[in-house]
């Protein structure tokens, strides 16, 4: 496949070969692999389709590499387009030299391109331009050229009253402006200072006067500094939120900033980089040296300081947002791929106090078969009536699982259900606490209204809770991922990039599992490779009118379901118990002829070999490769024949919260509890232990060994055993550890100082994580800033 053909969506004039080579280097692949992947993407193929069904073309690039390629492809194409536009602009100005052309041609980032373009970029009339128009550029050049000159004497030769240059000072000021602008547009100097600031700079934070009380959550940063290069993403976003709320004042600087009498390090760097000579800042400096020193100071203070501070803040935010989005995406993936309970009859209970608990029963297919509202708590306190109602519903519909939302009154509801189960043991029920994050958003959504037009909004939440136990993926795709609540500072990051990343995660998860085309909702179908909202609705409408699809081939009957959509979607759409057993597998219809050859070799019906590993023992995948289907695809076919429609999700398990532990007041240091990981951040993991307030396991308390990334140890939805270290009821803080040998702190019941609240506890760069220590870890004060995470 020619490498230069693989960019049909790129703008004319873009260097295709350069993009392919760059991408190949970045993802560690061959140029031919990248070229094939790019061509497939440009042809409308999706990442899941390419990863699963075009392994020969891409050399087996997985979905992670393809997602990276997809994002970087867009950036590099924009870079090439910008490169072309800059070259054209400078050429039209008649200022493009061979050296400049080479510099632009080898620039690898947008930042470098813009630095090179700065002197030639059309701009408003500046002080330097006014000085040039007054004839002062020769003065500036003369001072630079003559080490022995007296600037004031030279300046007297350049007076120009018509341009308001009436004395030597005015002339020297104009010359200074010209040189300052020239220096500030020197691409190599900018790159040097930028890297120096990033590698040695610090972020300083101090409290805005009078905000000590209002900004209590940010008190760890009232007098704080940390090197830019070591600041973790969550701390950057917390500091920037503090600035946005008017509590913190931030600035970027160097340690030497504090020494007011000495020249700023960047001023010295400017002088050194431009080879302006030694002694510019000495007490006995010559008039020329003193003047050039002032030019360097002016360049820094007036032209560069504010711009670089803004740029560095932007760089900090960009890197922090990228990491926060990565964490959110990883957590979302874990949540979507959580273990499904499967086709079981489930009673969903959405706890409430004053307005009552909403109840919905769904059958094994997810269909709502009954609803009720019960009032076991204040003000009615009809506990007995509630128990009888729940038991009657469970008996009538042969309920197997009870899903209890983890919001308000969750533990009280769980205890109520436990009492009901103890009174009616023959019902053989299992209770499970389920995250209800996003359930209220779904209840009031257009999707829910279309799905349940006759069902009260408040009851839809109970249905969602029940269904997300039955099949988390199928239910959670109906909710905006941002409403599910597994991100850090999700409202503070670039919303467009967040949406793009989360959409990619949802698409990858849905296609990794596969979708039953005869039972899936339109919301789930819309996430299948090659489909969209319109096609998904058309599939559901056709299904409602004509009944279940007997074969994948019948999908072609759906309006607007063309060959391209069929190619991209068919392998991910499953038809259990259909006319063709292969339609229930991940074998793509285009590869059915390969299966026919396998069946012919074995001399058996396909129904007799599916799921029968023994039947395939006498044949090898290599015997069935051809020009179209290589060994990777044929191996995948064999794997599907051995275990068709395999589900990548784990086995369903439930956590059991400890009886009698329902509020923060029930917790004491030293308690060992079972809980469920609800969120993973860079500084640790939040765990639901059944007290309405998630506890925090700091990264240093996740394991006996050093942990770099919490996700190496825990995942959202994972059941874990933890020990309570500290409890601070007043501030609703619980410090936990998964190192069960850690010593618990003495009980603190409300003085506001416990559970990792100590000043500066989050300054991870200054307090290295213990490697194998047995002491209680310094728990992160970031729990404050992340309190909103659970909303």
UniProtKB/Swiss-Prot annotation:
Protein's UniProt name: Protein tex
Any Gene Ontology biological process: nucleobase-containing compound metabolic process
Biased composition (Basic and acidic residues): 760-769
Annotated stretches, region: Disordered: 746-791
Role played: Transcription accessory protein. Exact function not known.
Keyword field: RNA-binding
GO molecular function, one term: structural constituent of ribosome
Gene3D superfamilies: Nucleic acid-binding proteins, RuvA domain 2-like, Tex N-terminal region-like, Tex RuvX-like domain-like, YqgF/RNase H-like domain
Recorded coiled-coil stretches: none
Taxonomy, superkingdom: Bacteria
InterPro entries from the UniProt entry: HHH_9 (IPR041692), NA-bd_OB-fold (IPR012340), Ribos_protein_bS1-like (IPR050437), RNaseH-like_sf (IPR012337), RuvA_2-like (IPR010994), S1_domain (IPR003029), S1_Tex (IPR044146), Tex-like_central_region (IPR055179)
A Pfam family reported for this protein in Swiss-Prot or TrEMBL: Tex_N
PROSITE patterns registered for this protein in UniProt: S1 (PS50126)
Domain S1 motif: 670-739
Organism this protein belongs to: Bordetella pertussis (strain Tohama I / ATCC BAA-589 / NCTC 13251)
């Amino acid at each position: 496949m020619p490498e230069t053909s693989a960019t049909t969506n790129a703008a004319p004039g873009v260097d295709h070969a350069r993009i392919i080579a760059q991408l190949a280097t970045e993802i560690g692949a061959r140029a031919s692999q990248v070229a094939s992947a790019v061509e497939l993407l440009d042809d409308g193929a999706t990442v899941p389709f390419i990863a699963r069904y075009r392994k020969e073309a891409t050399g087996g690039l997985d979905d992670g590499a393809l997602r990276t390629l997809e994002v970087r492809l867009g950036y590099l194409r924009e870079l090439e387009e910008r490169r072309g536009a800059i070259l054209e602009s400078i050429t039209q100005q008649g200022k493009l030299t061979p050296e400049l052309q080479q510099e632009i041609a080898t620039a690898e980032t947008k930042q470098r391109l813009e630095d090179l373009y700065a002197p030639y970029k059309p701009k408003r009339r500046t002080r330097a331009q006014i000085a040039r128009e007054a004839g002062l550029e020769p003065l500036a050049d003369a001072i630079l050229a003559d080490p022995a000159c007296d600037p004031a004497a030279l300046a007297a030769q350049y007076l120009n009253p018509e341009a308001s240059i009436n004395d030597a000072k005015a002339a020297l000021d104009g010359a200074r402006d010209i040189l300052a602008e020239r220096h500030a547009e020197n691409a190599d100097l900018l790159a040097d200072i930028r890297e120096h600031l990033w590698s040695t700079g610090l972020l300083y934070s101090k409290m805005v006067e009078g905000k000590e009380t209002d900004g209590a959550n940010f008190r760890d940063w009232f007098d704080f500094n940390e090197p830019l290069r070591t600041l973790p993403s969550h701390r950057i976003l917390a500091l920037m939120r503090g600035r946005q709320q008017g509590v913190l004042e931030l600035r970027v600087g160097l340690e030497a900033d504090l020494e007011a009498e000495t020249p700023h390090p960047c001023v010295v760097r400017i002088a050194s980089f431009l080879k302006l000579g030694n002694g510019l800042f000495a007490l006995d400096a010559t008039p020329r040296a003193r003047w050039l020193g002032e030019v360097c100071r002016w360049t820094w203070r007036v032209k560069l300081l504010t711009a670089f501070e803004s740029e560095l803040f932007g760089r900090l935010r960009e890197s922090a947002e990228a990491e926060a989005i990565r964490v959110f995406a990883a957590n979302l993936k874990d949540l979507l791929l959580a273990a499904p309970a499967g086709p079981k009859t489930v009673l969903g209970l959405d706890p409430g106090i004053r307005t009552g608990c909403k109840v919905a029963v769904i059958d094994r297919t997810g269909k709502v078969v009954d609803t009720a509202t019960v009032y076991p708590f204040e003000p009615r306190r009809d506990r007995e009536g509630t128990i009888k109602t729940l038991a009657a519903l469970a008996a009538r519909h042969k309920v197997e699982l009870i899903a209890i939302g983890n919001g308000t009154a969750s533990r009280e509801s769980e205890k109520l259900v436990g009492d009901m189960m103890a009174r009616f043991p023959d019902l053989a029920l299992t209770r499970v606490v389920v995250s209800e994050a996003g359930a209220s958003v779904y209840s009031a959504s257009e999707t829910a209204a279309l799905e349940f037009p006759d069902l009260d909004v408040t009851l839809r939440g109970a249905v969602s809770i029940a269904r997300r136990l039955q099949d988390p993926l199928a239910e959670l795709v109906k909710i905006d991922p941002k409403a599910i609540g597994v991100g850090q500072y999700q409202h503070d990051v670039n919303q467009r990039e967040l949406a793009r990343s989360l959409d990619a995660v949802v698409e990858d998860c849905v296609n990794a599992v596969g979708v039953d085309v005869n039972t899936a909702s339109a919301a789930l179908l819309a996430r299948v490779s090659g489909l969209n909202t319109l096609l998904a609705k058309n599939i559901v409408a056709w299904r409602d009118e004509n009944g279940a699809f007997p074969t994948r081939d019948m999908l072609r009957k759906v309006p607007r379901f063309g060959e391209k959509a069929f190619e991209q979607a068919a392998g991910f759409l499953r038809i259990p118990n259909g006319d063709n057993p292969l339609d229930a597998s991940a074998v793509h219809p285009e590869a059915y002829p390969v299966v026919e050859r396998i069946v012919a070799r074995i001399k058996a019906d396909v129904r007799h070999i599916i799921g029968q590993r023994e039947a395939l023992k006498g044949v090898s995948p290599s015997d069935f490769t051809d020009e179209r289907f290589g060994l990777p695809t044929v191996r995948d076919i064999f794997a599907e024949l051995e275990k068709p429609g395999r589900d990548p999700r784990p086995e369903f398990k439930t956590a059991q919260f400890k009886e009698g532990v329902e509020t923060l007041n029930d917790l004491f240091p030293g308690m060992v509890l079972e809980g469920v990981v609800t969120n993973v951040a860079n500084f640790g993991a939040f765990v639901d232990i059944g007290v309405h307030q998630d506890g925090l396991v700091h990264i240093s308390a996740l394991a006996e060994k050093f942990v770099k990334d919490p996700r190496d140890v825990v995942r959202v939805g994972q059941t874990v055993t933890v020990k309570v270290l500290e409890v601070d009821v007043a501030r609703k803080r619980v410090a936990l550890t998964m190192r069960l040998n850690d010593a618990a702190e003495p009980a603190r019941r409300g003085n506001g100082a416990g559970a990792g609240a100590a000043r500066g506890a989050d300054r991870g760069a200054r307090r290295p994580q213990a490697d194998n220590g047995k002491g209680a870890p310094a728990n992160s004060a970031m729990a404050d800033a992340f309190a909103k995470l659970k909303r």
